[in-house]
Regions:
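A compositional/biophysical signature of low hydrophobicity enriched in polar/charged and small residues
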Residues: 1-157
């Protein structure tokens, strides 16, 4: 990525809804070359898509938690397929350490979370153990990956 690509991804990370004309003005390109650059970043997989950032609490999902999951060795495929289909799970990551996976889960209340844990998540394929941490307050939700990546790349030179 060159300096112009970094400017583009940084600007889009801050506001993915801007027009190509606005983006071009921000980074110093006209509309057509800006569109071509963005298309190239999409084709290379650097830009994976565009989505609205929703406020879970405004949707009635007041409780955010992280659930560590330990599963049996032969259940990874089935577990991952079940997690992909479960609407309460917004993220799933494989982990190193005592657990196999980390899930980000939203619920309407602590009672709803308790129900999800006892009657749904604990029954996913291969689950041996769940350990849950409830978030009290979100301080930072979306970091600026473009700036961080560019900074660390420059430090390696």
């Amino acid at each position: 990525m060159d300096k112009l690509d970094w400017k583009i991804v940084t600007a889009l990370e801050q506001n993915g809804r801007q027009s190509f004309a606005e983006l071009g003005e921000t980074v110093g390109l006209s509309k057509s070359p800006c569109w071509s650059r963005v298309r190239g970043l999409e084709e290379r997989g650097i830009i994976q898509g565009y989505a609205a950032c929703l406020n879970p609490a405004a949707l009635g999902l007041e409780v955010q938690s992280y659930v560590e999951v330990r599963i049996s060795l032969d259940a990874h495929t089935e577990f991952e397929a079940a997690v992909m289909d479960h609407p309460a799970v917004s993220e799933c990551h494989t982990t190193a350490g005592d657990s196999d996976y980390m899930l980000k889960v939203f619920a309407r209340s602590v009672d709803h979370l308790d129900d999800l844990l006892r009657h749904e998540l604990s029954k996913l394929p291969g689950v041996h153990r769940l350990s849950t941490v409830v978030c009290l307050k979100t301080i930072k939700q979306q970091g600026r990956l473009a700036e961080w990546s560019r900074t660390t790349q420059e430090q390696r030179r």
